[in-house]
Amino acid sequence: QAALDPVASEKPVVVSPNPFYQIYEGATLLGNGEIVYANTTAPRFLPDWHSVPAEKWTRCKIVFVCSPDNPTGSVLTRDDWAQLFELQDKYGFIIASDECYAEIYFDGQKPIGCLQAAAELGRTFDNIIMFTSLSKRSNVPGLRSGFVAGDVELLKNFLLYRTYHGSAMGIPVQHASIAAWNDEQHVIENR
């Protein structure tokens, strides 16, 4: 919502993987955007970005990515990120990378996130925002504690948005969050 222009003459497009986490669609609709789905395809069940018509890409403001994905479990590789970055270079959209499941993997190989992929490919973090939380990492979905990182200008707008639309984190939640972020053993055991 913070990145969409609700008074634009044309509805901004937001591209979402399908299936998807419902908040992507809800935030798009609340921001007066048009949701367009990139269906996942076998065998890897990654979003098929090429199925999105060029006319939609030209109006695209945000692409939601979830890796590891909920609910498919699919994981983007550096090459997959590179392909998405090529589309971003062509159309100028923001990548909103949901990495709440990044700590849940089974083969000992930590998935590469959006910011890491950008850095390894020699890119800046322009028009990239990544978010994660303790919900999945630490099995505390009600705690509502996480963070965002990425493009400084996007983060400034996000901070302004959160200041007026968010809620403050209580001191007990802050202490519990610090303890959870500082403990890796429970994450390893959960994995």
Spans of features found by a protein language model:
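Short hydrophobic alpha-helical segments of the AMP-binding
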Residues: 4-7, 24-28
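Generic structural signal for small/hydrophobic residues in well-ordered secondary structure
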Residues: 14-15, 28, 63, 70, ...
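A short helix->loop->beta-strand "cap" motif at the edges of active sites that frequently abuts
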Residues: 12, 33, 88-94, 125-126
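Aromatic/hydrophobic pocket-lining residues that form π-stacking "cages" and hydrophobic walls in ligand
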Residues: 24, 84, 114-118
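Phosphate-binding glycine-rich loop
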Residues: 1-13
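PLP-dependent aminotransferase class I/II
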Residues: 127-191
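Active-site phosphate-binding strand-loop segment of PLP-dependent enzymes
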Residues: 40-110
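Short beta->alpha connector loops at strand-helix junctions that form conserved
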Residues: 18, 37-41
